[in-house]
């Protein structure tokens, strides 16, 4: 379906291959979702975080599929469904029809629920025109706190602000995932790619927020030295071939991964700046 705004957003991407085109459609749709959430006032009580946030607002050179949000404070009565209509309206403005459904976590398998708390609600945004594309939205309604946020600007599909975790707190969330995430009995290479990005860009790690995540998710009161040991063990023992294979469909330049080895990542860990 032709739409000037939507087509303009897609035109910024390299669409030569089917994988590239699929990644680009994902990302354009994610930005439209953010615009809808802004219009509905969602960011007055919540913030965007994790890989897709890093991709859209900080130029991470890999594509990301899911969208993760955290409330600014615990709210057991939080109802995300009131934001369905603003999202639907945002897509209507760019000529797209969408359907949003809350997922029943009782039906989740071990893979899907491995890193999902009881206090996280999950929603799927599905598209009439691109049937194979489904964007998963997770909202943590009882989040680990001690994080900071900032407002970040996007200009398409129109000018709007998104409340995001600051980089040190995004880094904290990623380091927690890298060390603790159990995912399909293997590692999630995208976590490793993002870890490399944070170190390369000299982003300091907010250990206070990281410790808060360890306490809430894993019931661990952890010191910095203990976390460093866990990180080193994870980095030195993982199957690097598996790590590379998992992230490959999401990166533009596969040669970036040539240097990857266990020793490479252990050395990166030694370069982490603590805030």
Name every feature range the model reports, one short phrase each:
Residues 49-52:
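Glycine-rich beta-strand-to-loop/alpha-helix junction loops that act as flexible
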Residues 55-63:
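Short glycine-biased active-site loop of nucleotidyltransferases that positions the nucleotide triphosphate
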Residues 1-31, 36-46, 57, 72-275:
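Structured mid-to-C-terminal alpha-helical surface segments
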């Amino acid at each position: 379906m032709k739409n000037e705004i939507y087509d303009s957003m897609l035109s910024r991407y390299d669409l030569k291959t089917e994988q590239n085109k699929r990644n680009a459609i994902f990302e354009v749709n994610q930005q439209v979702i953010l615009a809808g959430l802004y219009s509905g006032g969602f960011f007055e009580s919540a913030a965007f975080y994790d890989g897709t946030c890093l991709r859209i607002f900080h130029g991470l050179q890999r594509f990301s599929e899911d969208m993760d949000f955290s409330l600014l404070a615990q709210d057991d009565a939080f109802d995300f469904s009131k934001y369905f209509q603003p999202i639907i309206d945002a897509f209507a403005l760019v000529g797209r029809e969408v359907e949003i459904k809350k997922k029943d976590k009782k039906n989740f398998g071990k893979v899907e629920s491995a890193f999902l708390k009881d206090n996280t609600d999950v929603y799927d945004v599905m598209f009439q025109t691109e049937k194979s594309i489904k964007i998963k939205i997770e909202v943590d309604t009882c989040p680990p706190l001690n994080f900071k946020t900032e407002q970040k600007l996007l200009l398409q599909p129109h000018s709007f602000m998104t409340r995001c975790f600051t980089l040190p707190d995004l880094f904290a969330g990623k380091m927690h995932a890298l060390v603790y995430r159990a995912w399909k009995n293997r590692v999630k290479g995208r976590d490793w790619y993002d870890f490399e990005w944070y170190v390369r860009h000299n982003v300091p790690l907010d250990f206070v927020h990281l410790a808060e995540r360890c306490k809430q998710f894993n019931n661990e009161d952890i010191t910095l030295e203990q976390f460093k040991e866990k990180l080193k063990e994870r980095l030195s023992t993982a199957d690097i071939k598996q790590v590379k294979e998992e992230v490959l469909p999401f990166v533009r330049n596969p040669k970036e991964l040539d240097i990857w080895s266990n020793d490479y990542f252990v050395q990166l860990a030694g370069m982490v700046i603590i805030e």
